[in-house]
Amino acid sequence: SAPSVFGHLTVGLDENIEDMIFYKNILDSLILAKIVSSFEDINDKELVSFGASQGGAFSIIFSALNKNVTRCISLYPFLANFQHIYEKDNRINAYGELTHHGRWFNTTGKNTEKFLNNLYYLDTINFAKNLKCSVLFGITNLDKDCPKETQEKIYNEITSRKKSCIYKKYYHENIPNFNDKIVSFLLEVE
């Protein structure tokens, strides 16, 4: 298959969730962890997950599904609060394809509940409450791709040990200070 930049959220959305790209990506991450955990020099009882944006979502989802993860690091995670995003009708950010999908394939609104239910299976919020590991969570207040309110909703669902780093003047971008926080977080003794 060829590379793509649009449609990752909506491919397979009107069909079975098993046909959705992000569903397959999540399964791939679990398979990869199983492979890496079998390496001789890997301590498979103390895995760490890290990601930003889509990777931030995958870090949380993966950590919730793999009980060997002891630390999860997530910066402005994507894939959250789909109903809120869909109702905002934002066409220009990372979630824009939801609006386009609705306008092209759900013109009457008849299928809204079905495709939001399918997205519910991928919603990072639903995985956050199942985290058992320590979490370092970066929130960017000015982010247009992963709005602050969706990031906060994920964070508020986490019941395990957690620490947030709030960056009031940052968008969806590299945050050098967060890199320092990651190092400190990984060096902490629990």
Predicted regions and their residues:
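Hydrolase active-site cap/lid region
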Residues: 61-108
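Alpha/beta-hydrolase-fold catalytic nucleophile elbow
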Residues: 50-52, 75-76, 167-168
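C-terminal catalytic histidine-bearing segment of alpha/beta-hydrolase fold enzymes
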Residues: 145-148, 152-190
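Glycine-rich nucleophile elbow surrounding the catalytic serine of serine-hydrolase chemistry
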Residues: 51-61
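Alpha/beta-hydrolase fold nucleophile elbow
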Residues: 41-53
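Active-site nucleophile elbow and catalytic-triad environment of alpha/beta-hydrolase enzymes
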Residues: 111-127
